């Protein structure tokens, strides 16, 4: 029996009531889950910290896709980034280098036997569920997929 870790996160926003402006900025709500063997996780984490150092990032830095987009927008519009913006500290890297960091981060998964589960809600087509119910549906779907993977070899997921 092997032990696996599952990490889950979301991207995008969801609202029961959606204006045209909201739909333009948030056409999708996406939840992802990464399933990885615990032994592989240790190596992946070490390699990820080395990669962060290579790019001049702190160990605790988290790069969000919205940061990349916001940096791109501010630079394109030639506007100064306000000091209170979370992505201000990445201004010196710029969006292109952040995209390279993201690509290099994903490449770390290539030699590892990992599974990625994505659940996607099209906000333009989705019925008006409450945010809590939509989250439950996404998590239930992810959990079902993880359980199916674990049953193959009688493995354990945390």
Question: What residue spans do the PLM features occupy?
Answer:
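Phosphate-ester processing/binding pockets and catalytic centers
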Residues: 1-158
């Amino acid at each position: 029996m092997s032990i696996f870790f599952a990490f889950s996160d979301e991207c995008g926003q969801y609202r029961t009531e959606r204006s045209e402006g909201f739909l333009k900025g948030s056409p999708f709500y996406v939840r992802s889950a990464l399933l990885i063997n615990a032994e592989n996780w240790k190596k992946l984490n070490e390699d990820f910290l080395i990669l962060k150092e290579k790019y001049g990032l702190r160990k605790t830095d988290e790069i969000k896709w919205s940061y990349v987009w916001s940096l791109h927008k501010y630079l394109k519009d030639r506007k100064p980034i306000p000091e209170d913006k979370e992505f201000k500290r990445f201004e010196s890297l710029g969006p292109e280098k952040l995209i390279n960091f993201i690509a290099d981060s994903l490449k770390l998964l290539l030699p590892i036997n990992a599974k990625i589960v994505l659940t996607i809600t099209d906000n333009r087509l989705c019925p008006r569920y409450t945010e809590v119910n939509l989250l439950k549906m996404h998590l239930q779907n992810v959990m079902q997929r993880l359980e199916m993977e674990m049953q193959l070899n009688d493995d354990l997921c945390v």
